[in-house]
Amino acid sequence: MKRLRGTLPSDARHAWHPEPLGPAHRDGWDTRDDDRVWDVVVIGSGASGSVAADRLVRQGLDVLMIEEGFRLSPDLGNPELDDMCRTALARDGQGGWTDEGWPWTTSNLGGGTVFYGGASWRYRPFDFDPSELVDAGGLDVRWPYGLAELAPYYDVLERRLGVCGGEEGEGSRGPAHPPTAAAEVLYEAGTALGYEPFPTPLAINRHAHGGRSACERNSLCVSHQCSTGAKGDAVAVFLAPLAAHPNFTLRTGVRALRLNQDRPDAVGSVTCLDRLGRTTHRVRARSFVVACNAIQSAALLLRSRGGRAPDGVGNHSGLVGRGLTMKLSEYVSGVVDAPSAATLADWRAHAGPFSTIAFLDHYLDADCPTGVGGMIYESKNDMPSRIRDDVLELRIETILADHPNLDNRVRLSSHADEDGVPAVVIDYTPDPRDLRRLAYMTDVCERLLRKAGATGIAHEESGFAQGSCHLHGTCRAGDDPATSVVDGWGRVHSAPNVYVVDGGFMPYPGGLNPTLTIQAHALRSAKAVAGDLVSRHTAHV
């Protein structure tokens, strides 16, 4: 169980950035703030927490953000960071358990956005109400709102992030990045099969935008941090500007241990651990925004047991942690002869972006088991040097939504992590229907590659069942408190001054990369947080 205990901060100082992000930022807790009451505490600094904090600060609210990770040294890569992070218990697919479960995207300031490829999709109308085709065994898979409600928030975020590409005429996006040499081959093969390929939407500047430079295509932004600021990660777009704002406070290396529900209908404080000083502090606020990711947020709520929340905050229905979805995915690759020496040279000289072409032609597919297929897109190998000098690698990934299931859940272990906190258990077994769908979609991928003339077709598992970068469903949204954890605004039914704004709220995971949709939900929820605070203040005047 060694991996369940992550690296202590005292042993990882080489991984931190030597400078604070701005005047509002410091590592560890400041005891001068012990008696302060904040308007809002935001727990988590990744995709959703950064968006919510940005909106709340600009509404004039006094906001504290706590993040258990740290600001990373610019040279630190994703593999090195992963080696320092605690893991989780997870099913190993063979009837046993492994301590190599993965309960993060990454754990650091900015969260997984620091190492994601920038894929920024709008969900399809079907994703908001898949009930006609998706039977989740009694779980309601309908969202409390539809695409039209989220569209204005997508618009705002696409402009802020500098999203480029996507389907023609959709959204507020800039011009697409040039296709890679591999994408050009895939485009020809796809159109020959009758497909309608289009550029992958990416939160990466093609041209200078928002005070950030244009992409230089020098990495995939997955194993290494963006060196130019072109990628629209949470630090570059939201947190760095906020760090100079007078009503924003950022504390890294501070971990939320539990929420304290000291009134029948409200949480009054969060108990935190200063991971540097190893001291605990009770931090008070009027509202709390939980943005830790679908696994970590559920674990936090489950740890938050007390007299008014005996099973954990928000767990009035017994659903906190249940309905975990992580999407199924698989990579399929092959090689083709390079069209020319110049093409091959350009392909090797420019590693990024990781994806410049996508296909939604099988997103809904009557021939696929259940009628729900998935997405296919280019997913370049992060180590192309492994490929022979005279060929192009064509590597694609298929991603599809999994069926929510009450038995797939986040639980707490009897084992403790390095902070003495119960370790996370990822209790997840793929639905046989979804495995059949995945097999169908990988066959589709093979046909596409063979149409392109590829040889040496190979399959690569993603390991989704032990943890994923796409996490959803553990704090399900709905109108009925008996069958959901939060309402359509992310507001916890039994503690309405607590809001879950990460992917945990999703009653159905959708079949696309969820980051932009999670951010749009967080922006929408922040509007409710601000409005509720004003209403409560007015009621007491």
UniProtKB/Swiss-Prot annotation:
Q: What's one GO BP annotation on this UniProt entry? A: neomycin biosynthetic process
Which keywords accompany this UniProt record? Antibiotic biosynthesis, FAD, Flavoprotein, Oxidoreductase
Question: Domain of life, per the record?
Answer: Bacteria
Question: Which cofactors are reported in the record for this sequence?
Answer: FAD
The protein's GO terms of the molecular function aspect are: flavin adenine dinucleotide binding; oxidoreductase activity, acting on the CH-OH group of donors, oxygen as acceptor
Q: Does the keyword Flavoprotein apply?
A: yes
Quote the catalytic activity from the record.
Answer: 6'''-deamino-6'''-hydroxyneomycin C + O2 = 6'''-deamino-6'''-oxoneomycin C + H2O2; paromamine + O2 = 6'-oxoparomamine + H2O2
The broad enzyme category this protein falls into is: oxidoreductase
Q: Which InterPro entries does this one have? A: FAD/NAD-bd_sf, GMC_OxRdtase_N, GMC_OxRtase_C, P2Ox-like
What Pfam family does this protein match (any one)? GMC_oxred_C
- Positions of region (Disordered): 1-29
Pathway(s):
Antibiotic biosynthesis; neomycin biosynthesis
Coiled-coil segments on the chain, per record? none
Protein EC: 1.1.3.43, 1.1.3.44
Positions of the catalytic residues:
470 (proton acceptor)
Q: What does this protein do?
A: Glucosaminyl-6'-oxidase involved in the biosynthetic pathway of neomycin by mediating FAD-dependent dehydrogenation of paromamine to 6'-dehydro-6'-oxoparomamine. Works in combination with neamine transaminase to replace the 6-hydroxy group of paromamine with an amino group. Also able to collaborate with neomycin C transaminase to replace the 6'''-hydroxy group of 6'''-hydroxyneomycin C with an amino group.
Q: Which family does it belong to?
A: Belongs to the GMC oxidoreductase family.
By what name is this protein known? Paromamine 6'-oxidase
Give the organism, scientific name.
Answer: Streptomyces fradiae (Streptomyces roseoflavus)
